Protein backbone atom coordinates (compact mmCIF):
# COMPACT_ATOMS: atom_id res chain seq x y z
CA UNK A 1 0.00 0.00 0.00
CA UNK A 2 1.51 3.30 -1.11
CA UNK A 3 1.31 6.09 1.58
CA UNK A 4 0.13 8.91 -0.66
CA UNK A 5 -3.48 9.22 0.53
CA UNK A 6 -5.00 11.51 3.15
CA UNK A 7 -6.11 8.53 5.25
CA UNK A 8 -2.54 7.26 5.39
CA UNK A 9 -1.36 10.74 6.41
CA UNK A 10 -3.95 10.86 9.17
CA UNK A 11 -2.92 7.41 10.36
CA UNK A 12 0.71 8.55 10.45
CA UNK A 13 -0.25 11.28 12.90
CA UNK A 14 -1.38 8.78 15.51
CA UNK A 15 1.39 6.22 14.89
CA UNK A 16 4.95 7.53 15.08
CA UNK A 17 7.71 5.96 13.01
CA UNK A 18 9.54 2.88 14.30
CA UNK A 19 11.91 0.28 12.85
CA UNK A 20 9.17 -1.68 11.08
CA UNK A 21 7.74 1.45 9.47
CA UNK A 22 11.19 2.43 8.23
CA UNK A 23 11.65 -1.00 6.68
CA UNK A 24 8.20 -0.78 5.03
CA UNK A 25 8.95 2.67 3.65
CA UNK A 26 12.19 1.27 2.29
CA UNK A 27 10.33 -1.37 0.32
CA UNK A 28 7.83 1.19 -1.11
CA UNK A 29 9.83 4.01 -2.72
CA UNK A 30 8.11 7.06 -4.13
CA UNK A 31 6.85 6.90 -7.72
CA UNK A 32 6.04 9.63 -10.26
CA UNK A 33 2.44 10.10 -9.07
CA UNK A 34 3.55 10.55 -5.49
CA UNK A 35 6.23 13.01 -6.54
CA UNK A 36 3.71 15.04 -8.55
CA UNK A 37 1.21 15.04 -5.69
CA UNK A 38 3.88 16.19 -3.26
CA UNK A 39 4.96 18.88 -5.71
CA UNK A 40 1.40 20.12 -5.81
CA UNK A 41 1.20 20.06 -2.01
CA UNK A 42 4.62 21.18 -0.77
CA UNK A 43 5.31 22.31 2.75
CA UNK A 44 5.59 26.01 3.53
CA UNK A 45 8.50 25.73 5.90
CA UNK A 46 9.89 23.33 8.46
CA UNK A 47 7.66 23.73 11.52
CA UNK A 48 9.00 23.67 15.01
CA UNK A 49 7.20 20.37 15.62
CA UNK A 50 9.37 18.67 12.96
CA UNK A 51 12.46 19.20 15.05
CA UNK A 52 10.86 17.13 17.80
CA UNK A 53 9.84 14.36 15.41
CA UNK A 54 13.44 13.99 14.36
CA UNK A 55 14.16 12.41 17.72
CA UNK A 56 11.87 9.53 16.74
CA UNK A 57 14.28 8.38 14.02
CA UNK A 58 16.67 5.78 15.42
CA UNK A 59 20.28 6.95 15.67
CA UNK A 60 21.65 4.00 13.73
CA UNK A 61 20.41 1.43 11.27
CA UNK A 62 21.49 -2.18 11.35
CA UNK A 63 22.14 -2.52 7.59
CA UNK A 64 23.93 -0.13 5.18
CA UNK A 65 21.15 -0.65 2.60
CA UNK A 66 18.59 0.68 5.05
CA UNK A 67 20.83 3.69 5.78
CA UNK A 68 21.15 4.44 2.05
CA UNK A 69 17.35 4.24 1.58
CA UNK A 70 16.80 6.49 4.56
CA UNK A 71 19.30 9.03 3.24
CA UNK A 72 17.58 9.07 -0.16
CA UNK A 73 14.20 9.61 1.49
CA UNK A 74 15.58 12.41 3.61
CA UNK A 75 17.23 14.08 0.61
CA UNK A 76 13.96 14.03 -1.33
CA UNK A 77 12.13 15.40 1.70
CA UNK A 78 14.64 18.21 2.07
CA UNK A 79 14.36 19.09 -1.62
CA UNK A 80 10.60 19.33 -1.25
CA UNK A 81 10.95 21.51 1.83
CA UNK A 82 13.50 23.76 0.16
CA UNK A 83 11.11 24.70 -2.64
CA UNK A 84 9.18 28.00 -2.42
CA UNK A 85 5.77 27.82 -0.79
CA UNK A 86 2.57 28.09 -2.84
CA UNK A 87 -0.70 28.42 -0.98
CA UNK A 88 -2.64 27.00 -3.98
CA UNK A 89 -1.74 24.23 -6.43
CA UNK A 90 -0.93 24.96 -10.05
CA UNK A 91 -4.31 23.73 -11.34
CA UNK A 92 -6.24 26.18 -9.13
CA UNK A 93 -7.68 23.42 -6.91
CA UNK A 94 -8.03 23.16 -3.14
CA UNK A 95 -5.46 24.31 -0.66
CA UNK A 96 -2.61 21.85 -0.05
CA UNK A 97 -2.98 19.40 2.86
CA UNK A 98 -0.24 19.40 5.48
CA UNK A 99 -0.72 16.64 8.10
CA UNK A 100 1.89 18.12 10.45
CA UNK A 101 -0.03 21.40 10.88
CA UNK A 102 -3.44 19.95 11.79
CA UNK A 103 -4.72 20.50 15.35
CA UNK A 104 -5.21 16.79 16.00
CA UNK A 105 -1.55 15.95 15.40
CA UNK A 106 0.03 14.76 18.66
CA UNK A 107 3.76 15.26 18.68
CA UNK A 108 5.87 14.14 21.65
CA UNK A 109 7.97 16.99 22.99
CA UNK A 110 11.42 16.34 24.42
CA UNK A 111 12.29 17.96 27.70
CA UNK A 112 15.91 18.75 26.79
CA UNK A 113 17.11 20.41 23.63
CA UNK A 114 20.39 19.08 22.28
CA UNK A 115 22.33 21.83 20.51
CA UNK A 116 24.28 19.26 18.44
CA UNK A 117 23.27 18.89 14.77
CA UNK A 118 20.85 16.15 13.81
CA UNK A 119 22.78 13.12 12.50
CA UNK A 120 20.40 11.55 9.97
CA UNK A 121 18.68 14.57 8.35
CA UNK A 122 20.82 16.04 5.63
CA UNK A 123 20.47 19.78 4.92
CA UNK A 124 22.13 20.68 1.62
CA UNK A 125 24.46 23.60 1.68
CA UNK A 126 22.87 25.16 -1.39
CA UNK A 127 19.46 25.59 0.27
CA UNK A 128 18.59 29.29 0.06
CA UNK A 129 16.02 29.32 2.87
CA UNK A 130 17.52 27.08 5.61
CA UNK A 131 20.68 27.73 7.66
CA UNK A 132 21.89 25.52 10.51
CA UNK A 133 23.46 27.55 13.28
CA UNK A 134 24.02 26.14 16.83
CA UNK A 135 21.26 23.54 16.38
CA UNK A 136 18.58 26.21 15.76
CA UNK A 137 16.77 26.50 12.43
CA UNK A 138 15.99 30.05 11.36
CA UNK A 139 13.90 30.73 8.33
CA UNK A 140 15.37 33.58 6.29
CA UNK A 141 13.65 34.71 3.13
CA UNK A 142 15.58 36.54 0.51
CA UNK A 143 14.27 39.88 -0.64
CA UNK A 144 14.14 38.69 -4.26
CA UNK A 145 11.89 35.68 -3.48
CA UNK A 146 9.01 37.61 -1.92
CA UNK A 147 8.02 39.87 -4.85
CA UNK A 148 8.12 36.97 -7.35
CA UNK A 149 6.03 34.73 -5.14
CA UNK A 150 3.64 37.58 -4.36
CA UNK A 151 3.21 38.35 -8.09
CA UNK A 152 2.61 34.66 -8.88
CA UNK A 153 -0.01 34.47 -6.15
CA UNK A 154 -1.87 37.49 -7.51
CA UNK A 155 -1.70 36.36 -11.17
CA UNK A 156 -2.73 32.75 -10.57
CA UNK A 157 -5.68 33.64 -8.33
CA UNK A 158 -8.91 34.50 -10.13
CA UNK A 159 -11.14 35.43 -7.16
CA UNK A 160 -10.45 38.97 -5.84
CA UNK A 161 -11.97 38.13 -2.45
CA UNK A 162 -9.74 35.08 -2.12
CA UNK A 163 -6.70 37.11 -3.15
CA UNK A 164 -7.39 39.73 -0.47
CA UNK A 165 -7.83 37.05 2.23
CA UNK A 166 -4.67 35.23 1.17
CA UNK A 167 -2.79 38.52 1.09
CA UNK A 168 -3.81 39.23 4.69
CA UNK A 169 -2.80 35.72 5.77
CA UNK A 170 0.51 36.13 3.97
CA UNK A 171 1.26 39.39 5.74
CA UNK A 172 0.42 37.86 9.14
CA UNK A 173 2.58 34.74 8.65
CA UNK A 174 5.52 36.70 7.27
CA UNK A 175 5.34 39.17 10.13
CA UNK A 176 5.33 36.39 12.76
CA UNK A 177 8.00 34.18 11.16
CA UNK A 178 10.54 36.78 10.00
CA UNK A 179 13.23 38.15 12.30
CA UNK A 180 13.40 41.71 13.61
CA UNK A 181 16.20 42.57 11.18
CA UNK A 182 14.13 41.70 8.11
CA UNK A 183 10.90 43.44 9.22
CA UNK A 184 11.72 46.89 7.71
CA UNK A 185 12.74 45.38 4.38
CA UNK A 186 9.62 43.21 4.16
CA UNK A 187 7.36 46.11 5.05
CA UNK A 188 9.03 48.28 2.43
CA UNK A 189 8.57 45.54 -0.19
CA UNK A 190 4.91 45.05 0.72
CA UNK A 191 4.21 48.76 0.73
CA UNK A 192 6.02 49.30 -2.59
CA UNK A 193 3.05 48.27 -4.82
CA UNK A 194 0.72 50.42 -2.74
CA UNK A 195 3.00 53.42 -3.15
CA UNK A 196 3.17 52.82 -6.91
CA UNK A 197 -0.61 52.65 -7.09
CA UNK A 198 -1.03 55.80 -5.03
CA UNK A 199 1.36 57.92 -7.09
CA UNK A 200 -1.04 58.62 -10.02
CA UNK A 201 -3.89 59.55 -7.67
CA UNK A 202 -1.65 61.99 -5.80
CA UNK A 203 -0.54 63.56 -9.08
CA UNK A 204 -4.13 63.90 -10.22
CA UNK A 205 -5.26 65.41 -6.93
CA UNK A 206 -2.58 68.08 -6.85
CA UNK A 207 -4.27 70.34 -9.38
CA UNK A 208 -7.70 70.48 -7.71
CA UNK A 209 -6.03 71.15 -4.39
CA UNK A 210 -4.04 73.97 -5.90
CA UNK A 211 -7.18 75.37 -7.48
CA UNK A 212 -9.12 75.16 -4.26
CA UNK A 213 -6.33 76.81 -2.34
CA UNK A 214 -6.08 79.58 -4.91
CA UNK A 215 -9.86 80.00 -4.96
CA UNK A 216 -9.91 80.15 -1.17
CA UNK A 217 -7.16 82.77 -1.19
CA UNK A 218 -9.05 84.77 -3.83
CA UNK A 219 -12.25 84.53 -1.80
CA UNK A 220 -10.44 85.64 1.33
CA UNK A 221 -8.87 88.59 -0.47
CA UNK A 222 -12.21 89.56 -2.01
CA UNK A 223 -13.94 89.32 1.36
CA UNK A 224 -11.23 91.45 2.96
CA UNK A 225 -11.55 94.07 0.23
CA UNK A 226 -15.33 94.05 0.51
CA UNK A 227 -15.13 94.39 4.28
CA UNK A 228 -12.71 97.30 3.95
CA UNK A 229 -14.99 98.95 1.42
CA UNK A 230 -18.02 98.35 3.62
CA UNK A 231 -16.28 99.86 6.63
CA UNK A 232 -15.65 103.07 4.72
CA UNK A 233 -18.45 105.51 5.47
CA UNK A 234 -20.19 107.46 2.76
CA UNK A 235 -22.09 110.71 3.08
CA UNK A 236 -25.47 110.68 1.43
CA UNK A 237 -25.99 114.07 -0.13
CA UNK A 238 -29.47 115.29 -1.15
CA UNK A 239 -28.60 114.78 -4.83
CA UNK A 240 -27.42 111.22 -4.17
CA UNK A 241 -30.54 110.55 -2.15
CA UNK A 242 -32.70 111.81 -5.02
CA UNK A 243 -30.98 109.39 -7.38
CA UNK A 244 -31.55 106.65 -4.82
CA UNK A 245 -35.25 107.50 -4.52
CA UNK A 246 -35.66 107.55 -8.30
CA UNK A 247 -34.06 104.11 -8.56
CA UNK A 248 -36.32 102.76 -5.83
CA UNK A 249 -39.39 104.19 -7.56
CA UNK A 250 -38.36 102.63 -10.87
CA UNK A 251 -38.04 99.24 -9.18
CA UNK A 252 -41.55 99.42 -7.74
CA UNK A 253 -41.12 100.87 -4.29
CA UNK A 254 -39.05 100.22 -1.21
CA UNK A 255 -40.64 96.84 -0.53
CA UNK A 256 -39.87 95.41 -3.97
CA UNK A 257 -36.52 97.10 -4.60
CA UNK A 258 -33.28 95.15 -4.00
CA UNK A 259 -29.85 96.60 -3.20
CA UNK A 260 -28.35 95.08 -6.34
CA UNK A 261 -31.02 96.53 -8.61
CA UNK A 262 -30.80 99.95 -6.95
CA UNK A 263 -27.02 99.92 -7.40
CA UNK A 264 -27.41 99.12 -11.11
CA UNK A 265 -29.94 101.92 -11.62
CA UNK A 266 -27.93 104.50 -9.70
CA UNK A 267 -24.62 103.95 -11.58
CA UNK A 268 -22.56 105.98 -9.12
CA UNK A 269 -18.80 105.49 -8.87
CA UNK A 270 -17.49 104.51 -5.46
CA UNK A 271 -20.90 103.33 -4.30
CA UNK A 272 -20.99 99.72 -3.08
CA UNK A 273 -23.82 97.33 -2.45
CA UNK A 274 -23.21 97.60 1.30
CA UNK A 275 -23.89 101.35 1.24
CA UNK A 276 -27.04 100.84 -0.80
CA UNK A 277 -28.20 98.02 1.46
CA UNK A 278 -27.81 100.05 4.66
CA UNK A 279 -29.46 103.12 3.14
CA UNK A 280 -32.34 101.04 1.79
CA UNK A 281 -32.86 99.54 5.22
CA UNK A 282 -33.02 103.01 6.77
CA UNK A 283 -35.34 104.09 4.00
CA UNK A 284 -37.70 101.20 4.73
CA UNK A 285 -37.67 101.74 8.50
CA UNK A 286 -38.48 105.44 8.03
CA UNK A 287 -41.64 104.44 6.08
CA UNK A 288 -41.05 107.23 3.63
CA UNK A 289 -43.89 107.75 1.16
CA UNK A 290 -42.38 109.36 -1.94
CA UNK A 291 -44.04 112.46 -3.39
CA UNK A 292 -45.17 112.10 -7.03
CA UNK A 293 -42.64 113.18 -9.62
CA UNK A 294 -44.88 116.11 -10.67
CA UNK A 295 -44.07 118.00 -7.47
CA UNK A 296 -41.04 120.21 -7.11
CA UNK A 297 -37.92 118.62 -5.57
CA UNK A 298 -37.83 121.41 -3.00
CA UNK A 299 -41.09 120.19 -1.47
CA UNK A 300 -39.61 116.75 -0.91
CA UNK A 301 -38.35 115.93 2.53
CA UNK A 302 -35.40 113.93 3.70
CA UNK A 303 -36.02 110.85 5.84
CA UNK A 304 -34.96 112.70 8.99
CA UNK A 305 -37.35 115.57 8.26
CA UNK A 306 -40.06 113.08 7.50
CA UNK A 307 -39.44 111.38 10.84
CA UNK A 308 -39.67 114.69 12.68
CA UNK A 309 -42.85 115.59 10.81
CA UNK A 310 -44.31 112.23 11.66
CA UNK A 311 -43.41 112.77 15.29
CA UNK A 312 -45.07 116.18 15.30
CA UNK A 313 -48.14 114.73 13.64
CA UNK A 314 -48.28 112.01 16.21
CA UNK A 315 -47.91 114.64 18.97
CA UNK A 316 -50.72 116.69 17.49
CA UNK A 317 -52.94 113.66 17.31
CA UNK A 318 -52.20 112.86 20.94
CA UNK A 319 -52.97 116.40 22.06
CA UNK A 320 -56.16 116.38 20.01
CA UNK A 321 -57.30 113.19 21.64
CA UNK A 322 -56.46 114.60 25.06
CA UNK A 323 -58.45 117.76 24.27
CA UNK A 324 -61.44 115.74 23.14
CA UNK A 325 -61.19 113.64 26.26
CA UNK A 326 -61.15 116.76 28.45
CA UNK A 327 -64.20 118.11 26.64
CA UNK A 328 -66.07 114.89 27.25
CA UNK A 329 -65.10 115.04 30.90
CA UNK A 330 -66.40 118.63 31.14
CA UNK A 331 -69.66 117.61 29.53
CA UNK A 332 -69.96 114.80 32.00
CA UNK A 333 -69.39 117.18 34.89
CA UNK A 334 -72.03 119.56 33.50
CA UNK A 335 -74.46 116.72 33.15
CA UNK A 336 -73.81 115.68 36.73
CA UNK A 337 -74.39 119.23 37.96
CA UNK A 338 -77.62 119.48 36.00
CA UNK A 339 -78.73 116.21 37.52
CA UNK A 340 -77.98 117.52 40.98
CA UNK A 341 -79.93 120.73 40.38
CA UNK A 342 -82.83 118.74 39.04
CA UNK A 343 -82.77 116.56 42.13
CA UNK A 344 -82.81 119.65 44.34
CA UNK A 345 -85.74 121.11 42.41
CA UNK A 346 -87.58 117.85 42.64
CA UNK A 347 -87.03 117.77 46.37
CA UNK A 348 -88.27 121.38 46.74
CA UNK A 349 -91.33 120.68 44.67
CA UNK A 350 -92.03 117.66 46.78
CA UNK A 351 -91.83 119.71 49.91
CA UNK A 352 -94.14 122.36 48.43
CA UNK A 353 -96.66 119.72 47.52
CA UNK A 354 -96.58 118.36 51.02
CA UNK A 355 -97.18 121.85 52.41
CA UNK A 356 -100.08 122.36 50.07
CA UNK A 357 -101.59 119.05 51.01
CA UNK A 358 -101.28 119.88 54.69
CA UNK A 359 -102.88 123.29 54.16
CA UNK A 360 -105.72 121.75 52.30
CA UNK A 361 -106.18 119.26 55.05
CA UNK A 362 -106.14 122.07 57.61
CA UNK A 363 -108.75 124.07 55.61
CA UNK A 364 -111.13 121.22 55.35
CA UNK A 365 -110.83 120.38 59.13
CA UNK A 366 -111.89 124.02 60.61
CA UNK A 367 -115.75 124.03 60.11
CA UNK A 368 -116.09 120.60 61.48
CA UNK A 369 -114.40 121.69 64.69
CA UNK A 370 -116.77 124.72 64.93
CA UNK A 371 -119.73 122.49 64.58
CA UNK A 372 -118.36 120.26 67.26
CA UNK A 373 -117.92 123.17 69.66
CA UNK A 374 -121.40 124.52 68.93
CA UNK A 375 -122.83 121.16 69.56
CA UNK A 376 -121.10 121.03 72.84
CA UNK A 377 -122.33 124.44 74.07
CA UNK A 378 -126.10 123.79 73.81
CA UNK A 379 -125.83 120.67 75.64
CA UNK A 380 -124.16 122.52 78.48
CA UNK A 381 -126.95 125.06 78.45
CA UNK A 382 -129.55 122.39 78.50
CA UNK A 383 -127.84 120.74 81.29
CA UNK A 384 -127.69 123.95 83.13
CA UNK A 385 -131.38 124.47 82.44
CA UNK A 386 -132.26 121.11 83.50
CA UNK A 387 -130.39 121.48 86.77
CA UNK A 388 -132.65 122.94 89.57
CA UNK A 389 -132.03 126.53 90.43
CA UNK A 390 -132.15 127.55 94.00
CA UNK A 391 -135.33 129.30 94.92
CA UNK A 392 -135.08 132.91 96.10
CA UNK A 393 -137.38 134.05 98.62
CA UNK A 394 -139.98 136.41 97.33
CA UNK A 395 -140.56 139.60 98.98
CA UNK A 396 -144.32 140.21 99.59
CA UNK A 397 -143.79 143.73 99.49
Curated annotation (Swiss-Prot):
Domain HTH myb-type residues, every copy: 228-288
Subcellular location: Nucleus
Predominant localisation class: nucleus
Region (Disordered): 1-27, 359-397
Keywords (A to Z) from UniProt: Coiled coil, DNA-binding, Nucleus, Phosphoprotein, Transcription, Transcription regulation
UniProt xrefs under InterPro entries: Homeodomain-like_sf, Myb_CC_LHEQLE, Myb_dom, Myb_dom_plants, PHR1-like, SANT/Myb
Positions of post-translational Phosphoserine modification: 387
Entry's Gene Ontology molecular function annotations: DNA binding; DNA-binding transcription factor activity
One Gene Ontology term, aspect cellular component: nucleus
Annotated region described as Coiled coil, given as residue ranges: 319-339
Biased composition (Basic and acidic residues): 386-397
Short motif LHEQLE, span: 332-337
Mutant lacking the gene: phenotype: Separated male germ unit (MGU) with all nuclei separated from each other making a wide triangular figure.
PROSITE patterns listed in its UniProt record: HTH_MYB
DNA-binding region: 259-284
GO biological process: pollen development; regulation of DNA-templated transcription
NCBIfam families the UniProt entry points to: myb_SHAQKYF
Record PANTHER family: HTH MYB-TYPE DOMAIN-CONTAINING PROTEIN (PTHR31499:SF80), MYB FAMILY TRANSCRIPTION FACTOR PHL11 (PTHR31499)
Similarity remark: Belongs to the MYB-CC family.
Function: Transcription factor involved in male gametophyte development.
Protein name: Myb family transcription factor PHL4
Species whose genome carries this gene: Arabidopsis thaliana (Mouse-ear cress)
Gene expressing this chain: PHL4
Amino acid sequence: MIPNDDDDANSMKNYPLNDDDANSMKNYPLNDDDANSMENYPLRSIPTELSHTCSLIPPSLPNPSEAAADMSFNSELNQIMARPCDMLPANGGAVGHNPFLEPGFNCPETTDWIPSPLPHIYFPSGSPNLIMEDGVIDEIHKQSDLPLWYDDLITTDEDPLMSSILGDLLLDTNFNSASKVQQPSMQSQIQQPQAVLQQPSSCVELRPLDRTVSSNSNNNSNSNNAAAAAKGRMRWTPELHEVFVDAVNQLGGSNEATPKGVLKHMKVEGLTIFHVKSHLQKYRTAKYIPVPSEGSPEARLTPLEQITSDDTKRGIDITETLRIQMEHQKKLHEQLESLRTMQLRIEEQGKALLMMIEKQNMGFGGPEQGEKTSAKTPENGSEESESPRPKRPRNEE
